[in-house]
A protein has these predicted regions:
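Gly/Pro/Ser/Thr-rich low-complexity, intrinsically disordered segments predominantly at protein N-termini
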Residues: 1-191
Length: 191
């Protein structure tokens, strides 16, 4: 159960609770970590500068059911919903979730994660597939998810007001400097 999960797992443990079973997450490969830290700085910097809420990293447990907990790579919670933040586990859906799939992970793991986030009604889900160099963005609208899959172009967030990312930047090395992208995004957001 979630209470057992919280009792047994320490802050630095990399476990998810899947159908009542503790499952250790694979250590991240460098391409995953580079993209994670780049997106954390980009999305986190944007959200902080605009005062939109909070962006948290991969150590934040999100309760799916009483026997299921996920650790998304990134999540966003709007300022108006900050009361859902709990020191131990998010029992309500965040407003936006980002998951990164690395070469060593099975595609079916991503399908299960996506299904879990859909189950609890996360309004926006970005699934980044590093091996296939594709993004699958899902947006909840009137009880159903609209799905967009792409390898290039501009991906605009519905949950994070004014935020957008060029999909090709997620898959190229070196990536553009976060400070340059933030400056451009913030200028666009200023009326």
């Amino acid at each position: 159960s979630v209470s057992d999960y919280l009792r047994l797992c320490r802050e630095d443990d990399e476990y998810e609770l899947l159908d009542g079973v503790l499952v250790r997450r694979m250590a991240a490969q460098l391409p995953h970590e580079w993209l994670f830290q780049w997106m954390l700085r980009l999305v986190g910097g944007y959200v902080e500068a605009r005062g939109l809420g909070v962006v948290l990293g991969s150590r934040t447990p999100v309760q799916i059911t009483p026997y299921r907990v996920r650790l998304p790579d990134l999540l966003f919670v709007r300022t108006a919903r900050m009361q859902i933040l709990n020191p131990q586990v998010l029992a309500e859906p965040p407003d936006w979730v980002l998951e990164i799939r690395s070469a060593g992970e099975r595609a079916s793991d991503g399908v299960r994660s996506e299904s879990d986030y859909r189950t609890i009604g996360v309004p926006e889900i970005w699934m980044v597939d590093l091996p296939r160099q594709r993004v699958r963005a899902l947006r909840l609208h009137e009880g159903d998810y609209a799905v967009q899959e792409a390898s290039d172009g501009l991906l605009r967030s519905a949950a994070i007001e004014g935020f957008a990312a060029r999909i090709e930047n997620l898959f190229t090395e070196p990536r553009p400097r976060v400070s340059d992208l933030l400056q451009a995004l913030l200028q666009e957001a200023t009326p």
